[in-house]
């Protein structure tokens, strides 16, 4: 699982005059026509409540020069205790919510039309209602972030826990022509 490629994004939403945002690595395009995306948000994250109630969100695609300070504001603090948007470059989106433009490659807003409970997370499926490219800088990937910036927070899907890297456990199902893997106990 650790070799899957991810981006690093700020997903934001607002409800009843209050806004919140968070770092997310699971944002992906579903279709081009109509323009549809999905985001996976941990149910325990404050942003989840905002998206669930408002049925909308914005996404900021961060550039590969994004400082750890900005990632830290949206990734390691709760909006219950602090206004994450204070001192951060934003524009007001069509939904009336702040959209982060600081270190943004692009931004877009989306309206949720479906959601799927996937255990610890909800997958919000949405139609993109607007978007804008802001620069041609390359986007920040999770691999770059992990190599250069630090470790995933505990609620992130890519969190590895205190034990560090763990080998996947054997499921008994192997694809054809795959090398045999029996788990860490056999060393193979």
Regions found by a protein language model. Name each.
Residues 1-188:
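Basic, polyanion-binding surface patches
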């Amino acid at each position: 699982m650790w070799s899957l490629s991810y981006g690093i994004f700020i997903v934001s939403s607002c409800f009843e005059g209050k806004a919140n945002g968070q770092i997310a690595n699971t944002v992906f395009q579903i279709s081009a026509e109509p323009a549809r995306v999905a985001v996976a948000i941990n149910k325990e994250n404050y942003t989840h409540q905002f998206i669930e109630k408002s049925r909308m969100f914005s996404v900021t695609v961060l550039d590969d020069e994004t400082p750890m300070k900005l990632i830290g504001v949206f990734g390691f603090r709760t909006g219950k205790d602090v206004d994450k948007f204070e001192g951060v470059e934003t524009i007001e989106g069509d939904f009336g919510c702040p959209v982060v433009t600081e270190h943004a490659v692009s931004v877009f807003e989306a309206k949720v039309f479906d959601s799927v409970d996937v255990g610890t997370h909800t997958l919000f499926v949405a139609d993109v209602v607007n978007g804008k490219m802001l620069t041609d800088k390359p986007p920040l990937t999770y691999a770059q972030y992990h190599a250069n910036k630090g470790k995933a927070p505990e609620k992130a899907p890519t969190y590895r826990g205190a034990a560090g890297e763990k080998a996947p456990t054997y499921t008994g199902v192997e694809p054809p022509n795959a090398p045999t893997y029996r788990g860490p106990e056999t060393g193979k």
